[in-house]
Each structure stands twice: as C-alpha cells, then as structure tokens.
C-alpha cells in the first residue's frame, strides 16, 4: 500500500506507541509521529514493521476530541481516508483519518487466528507468563537496584534508592575511599534510566579514569558509554554535526574540555539530562578566583537538570571547598560563603546533641535547648521525658524519633551523602610486610620464591609500567613455568576481561596477575588477599587505589601487602614514609595527599636520591609527618557529622532492601522463566555446571536476533557471587538487558498471540469449545511520567465456556495448561473455520465482561498515583518549611506530574492481547 502524509499507521513491534501519523516521506524512508507517546520513528519503506489502520462500516471510531461514534461510510481520496460518522449529538459528520484518537484499542489476536497464523499452545503460555512477569517487574521496588554486578551493600542500595527516586536529583556523593562512590553513582543512574527520568548522560572525569568508568559502567551496569576526545569530534566537523548529539551516554575528560572551549559550547547545546563529575574536589574555587575547570562545570550544572558530584569527604576538602561543591548543586541556596559558615557553626551543637542520643547518654540542658530551637514546630518535651524514663523501649523509640526529625532538617543532609569506614561494617584488616633486599635486582628472585611458597594462593602484583609487567610474565613463565596473566592499559577491554577471568579461575587459572598501576583501574579482585607492590606508587592516593583493588567491601580475608625493595634505596625510604609517617599500608589515610603536598620538597629528595637526606633528617621527616597526621586526624574526627552518616547509611531500612534483593537472587522464578524463554525462542543451551550455561543462537530461532546474544554465544550465570568472580560471564537478573529486552520481544511481538490446543476430558462432551482470552490494561502516555509504576501493562485472564461463562477463577492457568495437548496445523485450521461464528461470539462476550474487571484496575492505579504523589508533595512541602535544601522547583514538577498523571490514567484503556481456543475430546 503506498504511503501518504496524514495516513494513520500502527507499529507492529511497538504497539504501546499507539496510532501514528505520517509526517514526512522521501524516496527511501517514512517518518511517523506517535502523539500518544510523544515519540517519532523513521522507518525504511521497504521493510517497515507497520500496519495500515483502516476502519470498516459499522465499527466504532474514537475522535481525538474524546467522543466516539459509529462509522456509516468510508471514502478513499488520494490515499487518505474520510469517515462518515454518527456523533453523540446524533449528527452525521465527516472525520478525516488524521483526527482519529491516537489511543487505540485493537485485536490483532483475532486477525491472526482467522488468517491461520496460529502458534503452539506453549507459545501462548510463554506470552501470558511474560505479561505477568512484565507487570510484576514494573511494579517491583527493586527495579533498577538489583541488576548491578556488585555485592549487596546496604548503604549503597539506600543511596541509590533514595536519590534514584527523586525528580532531577542534585547531590554530592562523598563516601570515604573504598566504599563505592562509583557504584552508587551508577546505581542512581541506572535507576533514573529505568524510570525514563533521564535519557542523555554526560560523565566528566580526570583523563586517567576514563577507562575505569567505561569498564565499570559496562561490566557492572550493562551501560554502553562512548569515549569522546578531540579525534572523535574531528570526524564530525566536516559534516557540521554536533558530535555530542550522536550518542546518548558519553564519557569525556575534564582536561580535554578545559583545553577545547569550542567543544564546551557543543556540550552546552546537546541537551543532556544528567551530569556526573568524578573527582569533583579537584575543581578549585575561591570567591575571587574560581578555576577554569570549576567555571566549566558550573556552566553545565546550570542547564543540566540532574547533577551527581563524586568527591572527597567534606573534612578532606575544607569548608570553603565543600561550600564550592554545594554551590554547583544549588547556587540560589548556597550564594554566600560567610552565610554558609555561620549556618554550619549554628548547627554544630545539634551534631553534639545527636552524639549523646546515639551514645544513650542523658541530654544536657544546653543540648535540649539546641534541639528545641531546631524543632520549633514540634512539641519535643514528651520525647525528652521519654528519654529520661526508666522504660528502655520507650527511651529508644523517643531517641530514634528525635534523630529522624533532626535528619529531616539537616542543613545539607538531602544533598550530601557521606559514609565512613567507621560507620560501615565488613572491612578486613590490612597487614604490611616490608621485604628488605640486598640489591634492587633481587626483587625478581624474591618474587619467584614468594610465588613458589604460596602456590595455592592468588597473588596480585602491581608494577609501575606495562613494560615491567610484560617482562615479569615472560621471566616467570620461562624460569619456573608459573602461570601468570598480564593486565595493562595497552590491552583492549576484552583482552583485560580474559586476563581477569584467567586469574579468577580457581582450578586452572593463573596464580598471579601482573598489572601496571593504570591498567588495574576500575577492576577489583576481592577473591585475592595478597598484594605485592613490585614498584611503589608515587603518591598516597595512587597507593590507596592499588590497595583498594583488594581492600574493599566484600573482601573476606585480611589483605597482606608486601613491599620488596633494596635496603636504603629511595623506594625503601618512600615505603617507610608511607608506613611510619602516614600508616597508609595498614589503614586508609584521608589526609595523605595533604601531607604529601606539605612535605613535597623533602619527599622529592627522598625519591630522587636515598642519600639526599641524612638518617637523622629522614627520621625527623618521619616524626614531623606522624605528628601532622595525628593532628589532622583529631581535627577530622572532631568534624565528623554523625547525623549525616546516619542519613547516608540508611540503617535497618537499607539492610531490609539488601535482604529483599538477596531473597530474589535465591528465587528460582527468574531461572525457570529465562530457560523456558530460551527454549521456546530456539536458543541453544549448554550447561557448564557451577551455576553457569552457554547460550548460542541457532538457525531455527523464532526471531532473527535475540537481544544481547552474540554469534559465538554468551556464558551466563544467575549467581551473584560467581558473577563477581567471573567478569566474562553475563550476570542475568530481571534488570539485565537480555531479560528485559527478551520480555519486550515477546510482549510486543506476535509470539503466542493466537493458539489452539486439545483438552482430553472424559466428563465433557467431545467438541466442547473453550476460549482463553488475555486482555491487557495499559496507559499510552509520555515516558517521563513513569505511569508504569502505577499501571504497568496488566494482563486480565478470562476463560469462557461455550455458554460465555467466565470460569477463569475456578480453573487456574497452570493447572489447565498442564493438561493441554497440541493439535496438528491442518486440524487446527479446519476447526477454526468450522467454529468461527462461535469463537467470534465468545470474543464479543469477553469484550463485554472485561470492562467490569479493567475499570477497577484503572481506578486503583489513579488512586495509588494520587496518594503516592500527593504524599511526596506534602512531605516535601513540610520539609521545605524547616529545611532550605528542598527546592521549590522539585515540588512544582511533582505537582505538574500529579495533574498530568491523573489525566493520562483517566484515558487508560484495554485491548485483547492474545487468545487460545481449546477443544475437548474424550481421548
């Protein structure tokens, strides 16, 4: 059928888009706008998955103005359809097809049945189960949180859930090293992407961390980011195309943007929804002279709605630098540094009062006064009395209630999340081993002896350069046949994956992984507990990054750190400074870089020449460093904000969230569904044992391509712990693209839309006709409203007997399905032709019955949306009265969303999605 502008067409692959209208044509493509979803698609004419929508005389037509009428006649003029329709005022009016409502109900299932496109009964069962799972996953509070390839760490899940559910979140993630800020940012981002709150994301990082972020986003979150640099952008200059509009997920370096201001203009015009900046503490700011980098990020933060800044802890930053980060997030709230300082000073006594509450101490009169001043609108006297009572349960309840009220009013608690190792359980100890050698060249011999002595252990060795790692591998292989994997920045991501997998293999893998310091960025090896620093990192931050490859949450054993170096060499003195001055081998040292800068001149002498400082001078340096460290440590401890830590940690709620995901991990429901899905689609499965399988495409699949399935096959696991140890395996969860897109493949395609089966039942007359009808209630609305959380596509099952009675509640789906047998294709086609009249009558009966079942679902969705959105609006309005960090714009957006959501839910409709005709026989 020829295309014409103004014609109405339906997408066969994306039914939820509603009825589209052709807006543009050229020789090869057709452009269709879908008003209901506010989406545009461009299709190749030759293979467009589109169906022309033509209504017939006697059918009901829905006008975009909201009324319906019976079609009296249809005329075709130059490819466009004109309908003569009886409107509600009983007038005959002409309706052009462009005026038809974009929200359309259709029943392709019936068309497929009567055109002999009939599937097996097992395909129908897969479709129904898929629809049920789709509904459950849209409603799940775990959606967007459970699919990360990471251990279930409560504080990370709490931050991801808290921030991810917000509208346009703007927050500072300031956890201590090793607590997973990158994972938190990725989980927040994934949550927002799943909810379709954001679609275009820009991540700005230091140049050395670009690949780390690329790897983390891909391996942990299945997010495919593109790295942008000058070379990539140059490719688009001749075409006058803004390169930043060619990808939705982009990573680039801060230094590159600083040195190429013309690219910054392109970024500003690319309409990103979300900005993530790592190492944000390096953005230098003062009231009189902010740095170029700071001003650059400030420009972006002004126009990009969602902003996540990953930074050092506020104590490390200093108050002025901390204010500068907050100013990027909310310049209206944090407009003046001196005002901010006064607010912080005023708040410190409240923090002290919280320390008393947490320590179960009696509150002093001064502490009570400070709490009362902050909670003016709340009568706190009864809580004070309860705390002073002898009833332990009442005491604890009152203390928790006071703490929660103070958290809600925390000066920056809604914008700032900061966890410390002291506040988070699960860290092992670090044990330092100084290995003193006679000569520098003895290091290789020592390493060989060490590996032979620890043959049953996994050893992680970090060298300064890739060349050293490569040479060591050759020496170990040739001299002692020691199995070693190499890991460095010159390898591709796939090559690094293979090396990591070889090292992770407990049975036949490498004993040792030889890595350059840059090459290991973004990779963690908690299954190993022995670290050899073949070359010492050049500064404390790099040292912490190296140790942090093993010393992370999830490490089950104490981490052994070995540093081999020649006696009295520059390396040995640097090791002593790290150990005796900073204690950086056995503990994290937040003040390490500050002390490194303070003693930079002396350390330069140490590193360049072991005799540049006498032993007395060097001992003096160690004492000075230790004294300065202890002084800084006391200051940092004084500045700890326990209230902020409580808010960041999430407490019992965070643990409950982790437990919920763990329970789902252990449920067989996903495994059963996925294996059945692969089986019916025609994907080959090979069981490898140890909770993993290889899935491969075949030439007999029901679809030409299965999402995420490579030609050479993919190894997958449903086991979180195995996925953490074996990065080359895909970790399948309900959130994995392969499962989500597999569900979409079935739900939006034709698999199982019409089926027929035989029921052997001696108690029913032979030839008795039953029909199973699956309707779907849905709202065709803009993605940003996230109406799927209130009204996901919801299946309604009817099972009609030959008299039109719904017996679905009496006969469960799985019970019935287990008793059905397949019918041959020829018999199926003959039976459908013979019973067509009865089938059509039963479908019409189903259309009548479903209304009374669908309307309460829509009403409940509206009620739920109203209650949930109103509750959040009321909560934020109440908090805004006592906490300036609640943005009015956030409340305004929520109010608009509530109005629009209720309006769109009022337009929700239902459609017949699939059907199964069942014929009985005695045998």
Curated annotation (Swiss-Prot):
Sequence ranges assigned to domain Helicase C-terminal in this UniProt record: 443-597
Start and end residues of each Helicase ATP-binding domain: 162-332
InterPro entries: Helicase_ATP-bd (IPR014001), Helicase_C-like (IPR001650), Helicase_RapA (IPR023949), P-loop_NTPase (IPR027417), RapA_C (IPR022737), SNF2-like_sf (IPR038718), SNF2/RAD54-like_C (IPR049730), SNF2_N (IPR000330)
GO biological process, one term: DNA repair
Chain ranges for the short sequence motif DEAH box as given in the UniProt record: 278-281
Keywords of this entry: Activator, ATP-binding, DNA-binding, Helicase, Hydrolase, Nucleotide-binding, Transcription, Transcription regulation
One term of GO molecular function: ATP binding
PROSITE patterns: HELICASE_ATP_BIND_1, HELICASE_CTER
SMART domains, alphabetized: DEXDc (SM00487), HELICc (SM00490)
Binding residues annotated for ATP, in chain numbering: 175-182
CDD domains registered for this protein in UniProt: DEXDc_RapA, SF2_C_SNF
E.C. numbers: 3.6.4.-
Keyword Zinc-finger: no
UniProt function note: Transcription regulator that activates transcription by stimulating RNA polymerase (RNAP) recycling in case of stress conditions such as supercoiled DNA or high salt concentrations. Probably acts by releasing the RNAP, when it is trapped or immobilized on tightly supercoiled DNA. Does not activate transcription on linear DNA. Probably not involved in DNA repair.
NCBIfam families assigned to the protein according to its UniProt record, in alphabetical order: PRK04914.1 (NF003426)
Homology family: Belongs to the SNF2/RAD54 helicase family. RapA subfamily.
Subunit structure comment from the entry: Interacts with the RNAP. Has a higher affinity for the core RNAP than for the holoenzyme. Its ATPase activity is stimulated by binding to RNAP.
Protein name: RNA polymerase-associated protein RapA
Organism: Haemophilus influenzae (strain ATCC 51907 / DSM 11121 / KW20 / Rd)
This protein's encoding gene: rapA
